[in-house]
């Protein structure tokens, strides 16, 4: 069974979102997603300062098995990326909810966060 922390929100496309301060949200891929992809070899992240729409492709995770698009769960401006993934993409596998985070986004509408899936909703989506 995948690790699905209850304090996070999720998307059906396997991104997780953590609320931080001042309308900023941290985004990564779920434990389920990283386990399906296998060992990460490269992560292509969005540009800091870029504006991303909800559901837009904004990053790519490349593993030994496949390359997978990552979609923004919220609309907003990219305010930070996890630059350590350039040298150590395996952090996405080892700690997808901590050191393996991908980017931080300042949401245009922080209320979008409430509409994302709860841990229970995400687990139910996995079972479908």
UniProtKB/Swiss-Prot annotation:
What's the record's note on cofactor binding? Binds 1 lipoyl cofactor covalently.
Name positions with the PTM N6-lipoyllysine.
65
Top-level taxon in the UniProt lineage: Bacteria
Name the keywords, alphabetized: Lipoyl
Q: Which NCBIfam families match?
A: gcvH, PRK01202.1
The Swiss-Prot or TrEMBL record describes its family as follows: Belongs to the GcvH family.
Its function, per the record, reads: The glycine cleavage system catalyzes the degradation of glycine. The H protein shuttles the methylamine group of glycine from the P protein to the T protein.
Name of the protein in question: Glycine cleavage system H protein
The scientific name of the source species is Edwardsiella ictaluri (strain 93-146)
Q: Taxonomic lineage of this organism?
A: Bacteria, Pseudomonadati, Pseudomonadota, Gammaproteobacteria, Enterobacterales
Name the gene behind this protein.
gcvH
């Amino acid at each position: 069974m995948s690790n699905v922390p209850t304090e996070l929100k999720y998307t059906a496309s396997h991104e997780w979102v953590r609320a931080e301060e001042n309308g900023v949200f941290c985004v990564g891929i779920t434990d389920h997603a990283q386990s399906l992809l296998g060992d990460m070899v490269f992560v292509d992240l969005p540009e800091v300062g870029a504006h991303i729409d909800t559901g837009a492709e904004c990053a790519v995770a490349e593993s030994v098995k496949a390359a997978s698009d990552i979609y923004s769960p919220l609309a907003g401006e990219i305010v930070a990326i996890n630059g350590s993934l350039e040298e150590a993409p395996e952090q996405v596998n080892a700690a997808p909810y901590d050191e393996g985070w991908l980017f931080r986004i300042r949401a245009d509408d922080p209320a979008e966060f409430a509409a994302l899936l709860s841990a229970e909703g995400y687990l139910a989506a996995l079972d479908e």
